[in-house]
Swiss-Prot record:
The lineage of its organism: Eukaryota, Metazoa, Chordata, Craniata, Vertebrata. GO terms for biological process: negative regulation of transcription by RNA polymerase II. Involved in both transcriptional activation and repression. Interaction with SIRT7 leads to recruitment and stabilization of SIRT7 at promoters, followed by deacetylation of histone H3 at 'Lys-18' (H3K18Ac) and subsequent transcription repression. Forms a ternary complex with the serum response factor (SRF). Requires DNA-bound SRF for ternary complex formation and makes extensive DNA contacts to the 5'side of SRF, but does not bind DNA autonomously. This is ETS domain-containing protein Elk-4. The keyword RNA-binding does not apply. Pfam families: Ets (PF00178). Residues 116-138, 245-279, 292-325 are annotated as: Disordered. Residues 249-272 have a biased composition (Pro residues). The gene is Elk4.
């Protein structure tokens, strides 16, 4: 027997064989039949399909598939009783089953196609659909249409693709090589100039440092709102001089060489007639006196004659400086024999607070003094009482009383370098 037979065809075959009447039999002439020995029929169906564990439960579930296909239906109220939906037409399928059993495959295919056409014209019975589908599929596969179509399409498409790839690949490679060759040179030309411009602004800043003085008032006003306690550290003395001209208010903690390099460019014009300072530093600072003169803003016109006299006198004889301007974060005692001992590397710094001196550089030019006073006035809780706020940014603030006095004086707010307080009220007179 053929294992490709369907379940409804197997049942119809058993009904047509008289030796199987003890297992299955017709109950009426309208296509009803009953399974007398349901388990035996299920066992035979399992042998046909090579499923030894077949039973009636599985067989009944398989019959439900034909309920949907409208081939077999269950008779209500009767156990093991089923019915072929279109019984007269279902008998025409007997030659198919017999042909399958005998092995006449060619006759089977022809009969299936003819029966499927008859069923389609009838419109009621659909049993031959599975057979018709298989036969039509087999006919389509064995015919030359399927194979010739796919092979021809693949051959033509492959030839075209291979030709196009062989022609286009060298051109694409050449185009990519040409496009990639100029790129390294372009990158080199772009990157090599980019490394040099950072050096140019430093030289330009040195060249144009005197021209920055007219905009000092605007820079002070901008720094009042934008200044912060922590700014990037200054690495070279040249950057410190630039910041002094632009009134940068917060010089951070410099390294140890910075206080040693500052004295040559920080001697101030004499403002009083009190010679109390050693002459060693004056001889060292005689050469770079021109830079503070160029960097000073408004006091240049007022005290221009005094630095010139100092220059002439320094060449002939040693003359002691007359005044010393200090930042608000310094304490000078009267017992110190040399007030400028802090500037020489060999002399001890016993007259100063070491922490304050390491964090606050000494600026002897008038313009950095104004900037530092103005900056500390912005941080002070008594900002309206600070001298820079009272006299404004247009006029240069000086301390004649402090510079002319010989006695020791202290500045308030020396507890920490970050929060210095304002000057005492007596310092604001005149």
């Amino acid at each position: 027997m053929d294992s490709a037979i369907t379940l409804w065809q197997f049942l119809l075959q058993l009904l047509q064989e008289p030796q199987n009447e003890h297992m299955i039999c017709w109950t009426s002439n309208n296509g009803e039949f009953k399974l007398l020995q349901a388990e035996e029929v299920a066992r035979l169906w399992g042998i046909r399909k090579n499923k030894p564990n077949m039973n009636y439960d599985k067989l009944s579930r398989a019959l439900r598939y034909y309920y949907v296909k409208n081939i077999i239906k269950k008779v209500n109220g009767q156990k093991f009783v089923y019915k072929f939906v279109s019984y007269p037409e279902i008998l025409k399928m007997d030659p198919l089953t017999v042909g399958r059993i005998e092995g006449d495959c060619e006759a089977l295919n022809s009969i299936e196609t003819s029966s499927s056409k008859d069923v389609e014209y009838g419109g009621k019975e659909r049993p031959p659909q599975p057979g018709a589908k298989t036969s039509s599929r087999n006919d389509y596969i064995h015919s030359g249409l399927y194979s010739s179509f796919t092979l021809n399409s693949l051959n033509t498409s492959n030839k075209k693709l291979f030709k196009s790839i062989k022609i286009e690949n060298p051109a694409e490679k050449l185009a990519e090589k040409k496009a990639q060759e100029p790129t390294p040179s372009v990158i080199k030309f772009v990157t090599t100039p980019a490394k040099k411009p950072p050096i140019e602004p430093v030289a330009a800043a040195f060249a144009t440092s005197p021209s920055l003085s007219p905009s000092s008032e605007e820079t002070i006003q901008a720094l009042e709102t934008l200044v912060s306690p922590t700014l990037p550290s200054l690495e070279t003395p040249a950057s410190i001089s630039i910041l002094a001209t632009t009134f940068n208010p917060t010089p951070p903690v410099p390294s140890t060489p910075l206080p040693l390099k500052e004295p040559p460019r920080t001697p101030s014009p004499p403002l009083s007639s009190n010679p109390d300072i050693d002459t060693d530093i004056e001889s060292v600072a005689s050469q770079p006196m021109e830079l503070p003169e160029n960097l000073s803003l408004e006091p240049k016109n007022e005290d221009s004659a005094l630095p010139e006299k100092d220059k002439t006198n320094n060449s002939s004889r040693s003359k002691k400086p007359k005044g010393l301007e200090l930042t608000p974060a310094l304490v000078v005692t009267g017992s110190d024999p040399s007030p400028l001992g802090i500037l020489s590397p060999s002399l001890p710094t016993a007259s100063l607070t070491p922490a304050l001196f390491s964090q606050t550089p000494i600026l002897l030019t008038p313009s950095p003094l104004l900037s530092s006073i103005h900056f500390w006035s912005t941080l002070s809780p008594f900002a309206p009482l600070s001298p820079a706020r009272l006299q404004g940014a247009n006029t240069l603030f000086q301390f004649p009383s402090v510079l002319n006095s010989h006695g020791p004086f202290t500045l308030s707010g020396l507890d920490g370098p970050s929060t210095p307080g304002p000057f005492s009220p007596d310092l604001q007179k005149t």
